[in-house]
Amino acid sequence: MRIAGIDIGSRSMELVVREPDSASGWTTTVQRRLPTTFDPVRQCRLLLEDCMPDRIVATGYGRALVQDMDLGVPVETVTEIRAHALGACHHFPQARTVLDIGGQDTKAIALLPGGKVGRFEMNDRCAAGTGKFLEYTATVFQMDVASFGAYAMLGTEAPVINSMCTVFAETEATSLMAQGVKPENIALGLHQSIVRRTVNMLRRVGLEFPLVFAGGVANNPCIRDLLARELGADSGSLLIPDEPDMGGALGAALWGATSLG
């Protein structure tokens, strides 16, 4: 029995395939990622190429698309909140809170004993505080988002960025440049604005440590550093998976295995 978890997000889609293993129960045999693009159905078929499972569990914005694709195997769905909670707890069973910052949304999840979901909050109505915010504002500095975090870490004094609207934040950054503020300091201020918003979300759901930080934005070194400092968290209380953007797909696959009984 091969179970695939697919997480179809607005920016990318991830696949995790798990199979029974005599030593450990289940093991991950496939991990893949593709951009979602404007044709998510085609991309999903490419993602599954040469590894068609016996069962699929889909999560993310596009999970309903997978059910309509006539893939010839049973397909079910699981909510993003539950999938990300399962993925985080698989890596870190001691986790008490999960923060997932993706391309278009931010999820803060408080966990109950046993990894069950307690309170949660999700910002999915605008790009503020998400990977899209970083991607958009990075263009002001004429650089790609992959380099933006390291550049922001060169800053020494972060100006306060008051607007969390992506468009207005770009205008504010441009205005600060015109005032002679160092670009690397502005970049640091933009990162700090995300962290402030995120920490407020975490506190509203009832932050407890250890905190698992996942999602594509967890790859940003500046966000990681600022979040740890803002929370006063050490390496034992702020936990980051080796592949932080695979958590949703992993959680979906885990859900599929669990629901088999």
Language model features with spans:
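Short glycine-rich, Thr/Ser-proximal phosphate-binding strand/loop in the N-terminal lobe
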Residues: R2-L46, V117-C126
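Short glycine-aspartate micro-motif
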Residues: I3-D7, R55-A58, R96-L99
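Conserved phosphate-binding catalytic cores of ATP/NTP-utilizing and phosphoryl-transfer enzymes
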Residues: C44-L46, V66-G102, K107-G115, R119, ...
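Glycine-rich phosphate-binding loops at beta-strand->alpha-helix junctions
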Residues: Y61-G62, L207-E230, P244-D245
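Conserved phosphate-binding/catalytic loops in two-lobed NTP-binding clefts
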Residues: P74-I81, L227-L250
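Glycine-rich phosphate-binding/hydrolytic loop that grips phosphoryl groups
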Residues: L86, G131-E135, L239-G261
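Glycine-rich phosphate-binding loop plus the immediately following alpha-helix
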Residues: K116-E157, N162, L254, T258
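Adenine-nucleotide phosphate-binding core of ATP-dependent small-molecule kinases
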Residues: A169-R203, D245
